């Protein structure tokens, strides 16, 4: 190699090193080193789920987001348990109506497919233990909870032939199968209740809303496996702005054909109710599983108070199509639906995978400490 070639080579190396080995700045104080759960140091074969989940904060990626979500929910619960500091007049004006006023109102939202799945039992636990204050779901989140009290759904696969299932009277939701007979049983149970509601509308001038109708259905189902049973028992309002978008809507349609005048369901009274809940709350926390109308209805109610104080999203939606379903929490901050100080977090995951883990480290542990 010539002297010129050697000099050029050294210059190239120096240039490459300067590009590759850029000097690092000082790591900020409090930075968390990345480290996952070490099974080799676990104490015996009976290490706890809690020990694994406690390592998630330093694991990175969505494990860290789940750990942050757990922190957020525990902050909601801690704040909710804080004694109220307000005058007696304010305490006499509680929201939601018929419930004890809390220092933090927890909104829980979930899409219908999650009630179709076994996540129904996890959701029911939170409602049964009276740990949330306001629920928003879609029509399937109402009907699937009630139908499962009448007849079960079954495990299938994602790849089952649709035409064959149709000819056999089986409906597929992901890898869950719902026989058509389930909806027949639902119709037989529901129609007499709708008849009663119509009589009350005409004779007592009762103005039905989705939440009032859902409260009635929860009272009538009489089954402790039901989310709505416990919501009715604890007077937790369940809002469903898209009540007609599902089998429940089919039944309302069938009922309207045979009834004149028909049953009327007022969504305006309900939007006033949920917005007033948000406005009259001292602090609010939102836990939203999935997207669509469920996510936006909770966020928009919190806009009326200039944003939720704590927010957790769990969904698989992406923001690149401009949808509200996939939007990050910071987009909601721009609209005033989440406070900038909320420490909001989105867990990019399918809710049946991670919500039971979150409940284990938050709601269940909270109740365990009380017991």
Swiss-Prot record:
Pathway noted in the entry: Protein modification; eIF5A hypusination
Co-factor(s): NAD(+)
One example of a Gene Ontology biological process annotation: spermidine metabolic process
Keyword NAD part of the UniProt annotation: yes
GO cellular component entries: cytoplasm
Positions bound to spermidine: 143-144, 250, 296, 322-324, 331-337
Binding site for NAD(+): 112-116, 138-140, 144, 245, 291, 316-317, 350-351
Keyword Transferase included in the entry's annotation: yes
Pfam families registered for this protein in UniProt: DS (PF01916)
Transmembrane regions: none
Catalytic activity: [eIF5A protein]-L-lysine + spermidine = [eIF5A protein]-deoxyhypusine + propane-1,3-diamine
Top EC class of this enzyme: transferase
Record-level Gene Ontology MF annotations: deoxyhypusine synthase activity
Domain of life assignment: Eukaryota
Keywords: Hypusine biosynthesis, NAD, Transferase
EC number: 2.5.1.46
Active site as annotated: 337
PANTHER family: DEOXYHYPUSINE SYNTHASE
Function statement: Catalyzes the NAD-dependent oxidative cleavage of spermidine and the subsequent transfer of the butylamine moiety of spermidine to the epsilon-amino group of a critical lysine residue of the eIF-5A precursor protein to form the intermediate deoxyhypusine residue. This is the first step of the post-translational modification of that lysine into an unusual amino acid residue named hypusine. Hypusination is unique to mature eIF-5A factor and is essential for its function.
Family: Belongs to the deoxyhypusine synthase family.
Protein name according to UniProt: Deoxyhypusine synthase
Protein's organism: Caenorhabditis elegans
Organism lineage: Eukaryota, Metazoa, Ecdysozoa, Nematoda, Chromadorea
